[in-house]
Amino acid sequence: MSAPVFGRLLTAMVTPMTFDGAVDLRRTGELAHKLVEEQNNDGIVVNGTTGESPTTTDSEKAEIVKAVVEAVGSDAAVVAGVGTNDTAHTIELAHQAAEAGADGLLVVTPYYSKPSQAGIIEHFTAVADATDLPIMLYDIPGRTGTPIETKTLIELADHARIVAVKDAKGLVVESATVMASTTLAYYSGDDAITPALLSVGGVGLVGTSTHFTGRRMHEVIDAYVDGRIDEALSTYREILPVLTGVFAAQGATMVKAGLAHQGFTVGRVRPPQTMPTPEQAETFFGVLDRTQL
């Protein structure tokens, strides 16, 4: 089986901040390098929700892409989140990411305004037409308010540059239906249900817990793809407490706390997000320590 265009394991990376809340570009590059070299990531997703994209400026987003591209070179794909609820602005960010050296684009469904499925098709098509970069659609109705319906995904798959989906909808049968009718590469957008998506044809994971579990999750995915299902599930069960525990608070906040616990400081989150409570943090630190990650 050929490897999917973005690889099998990507981490939706947090954005390191300095003590005074500025984007720490040096630490950004160091974290990206760490995720590739130590956690065996095939790709890094920047400027996504976990990267605090709602609170970073357009110019900061461009500098983040450049820093990560410089840090990982050709060792990993760099996928830039460019999704907004404004088609024109999304296209601007797509151009900016392409100029900054991104290898692909992550484009979320327009949020808050709840466009029709026809509007969603027009939006994604316009963004796909704007650059030569391959696109991963991001289907996360719990945050956007609007799902990408099965028939919409099947229609969008006809576009040559729409090649993948980050699926955080959690409806595995619907995902299987799309995969049966298209060549879209499906990545789990929910760390804990990765084996379920793999079982119906998914290719990998865009993860959050993979800041800590990346190497082990790659083992899970590789074993599953190779047909070593018992081995895959055994490893998965060992790390499952981390896959779920990282979401006991907002993902970015728990990741930043967990990295600091392991001696790799990346600063705090920008408002309105807040860091985990001491109780939440200590519980998660215990999970990390017991799992020996």
UniProtKB/Swiss-Prot annotation:
It is an enzyme of class 4 (lyase). NCBIfam families: dapA. Pyruvate binds at residues 50, 206. Its EC number is 4.3.3.7. Homotetramer; dimer of dimers. The record marks 49, 112 as: Part of a proton relay during catalysis. GO terms for cellular component: cytosol. PROSITE patterns: DHDPS_1, DHDPS_2. SMART domains: DHDPS. Pathway: Amino-acid biosynthesis; L-lysine biosynthesis via DAP pathway; (S)-tetrahydrodipicolinate from L-aspartate: step 3/4. This is 4-hydroxy-tetrahydrodipicolinate synthase. The keyword Amino-acid biosynthesis applies. The gene is dapA. It comes from the Bacteria. Catalyzes the condensation of (S)-aspartate-beta-semialdehyde [(S)-ASA] and pyruvate to 4-hydroxy-tetrahydrodipicolinate (HTPA). The active site is at 138 (proton donor/acceptor), 166 (schiff-base intermediate with substrate). Belongs to the DapA family. It comes from Cutibacterium acnes (strain DSM 16379 / KPA171202). InterPro entries: Aldolase_TIM, DapA, DapA-like, Schiff_base-form_aldolases_AS, Schiff_base-form_aldolases_CS. It catalyses: L-aspartate 4-semialdehyde + pyruvate = (2S,4S)-4-hydroxy-2,3,4,5-tetrahydrodipicolinate + H2O + H(+). One of its GO terms (biological process) is lysine biosynthetic process via diaminopimelate. GO terms for molecular function: 4-hydroxy-tetrahydrodipicolinate synthase activity. Keywords: Amino-acid biosynthesis, Cytoplasm, Diaminopimelate biosynthesis, Lyase, Lysine biosynthesis, Schiff base. It is found in: Cytoplasm.
